[in-house]
Amino acid sequence: MELSHIIVLALVQGISEFLPISSSAHLVLVPKLLGWADQGLAFDVAVHVGTLAAILFYFKDRLAGLVRDFFASIARREKVGDSTLVWSVGFATVPVGLFGLAFNDAIEQYARSGLVIAAMTIIFGIALYFADKKSGLKTEYEMTIKLALIVGLAQAIALIPGVSRSGVTMTAALMLGFSHSASANFSFLLSIPVIVLAGGLEAVKLLKTPDALPWSDLAIGAAVSGLSAYLCVRLFMALIARASMLPFVIYRMILGVFLFVMFL
């Protein structure tokens, strides 16, 4: 890959991974607009490593506390600190894992068209608009197992390209009365096991290919996606604490219409 391609695609992945705007829509749009070939599986793994590193670094202090509370709760067989939040993230991850195993092949075959991505971008942009009006004051620490499973079921829908994993999980949390910040925080924490699972599956496929890997290209892609993702999360959290989701809704509408025009 050319250096310019690496930087642009890694930036697109890093910026769109955690915003409620659908990274898959952008990764379809940009190469088509610019006439670039598919970036390949190795690059996908690299940028996932970058975005995972970004969110781990952003939450490093909180994650240390959550892990400590989680293992303490197991040892004592009772709730310790914020251990319930860890269980909530775990239970919310189950649906996407099960749905992925059951329907991934069908989704790959039938749902990766430009028109499907365009439709999902618009439909779930509208859902985000209405969910935004339902936001409440609940914090992520009030996430029960039942509510986490509801968010997890919503996340499973994001296996369909164009839905946006972060967008649909924030939408579900907002509909359940969580605040903007809490919805985003839970969505981002939930991204950690999902990125690990998705990246792990891609890595397994990659190990089965005999091709030599362009390590320097992959390192650049991981670094650019990681840095851009980290900065994007920081800016988004600062913005969402005092603003609505409307800018992202409008952006999704425009993007969806543009995708329809391109693929019709």
Regions found by a protein language model. Give the residues of each.
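Multi-pass membrane proteins that catalyze or facilitate reactions on polyprenyl-/lipid-phosphate substrates
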Residues: 1-264
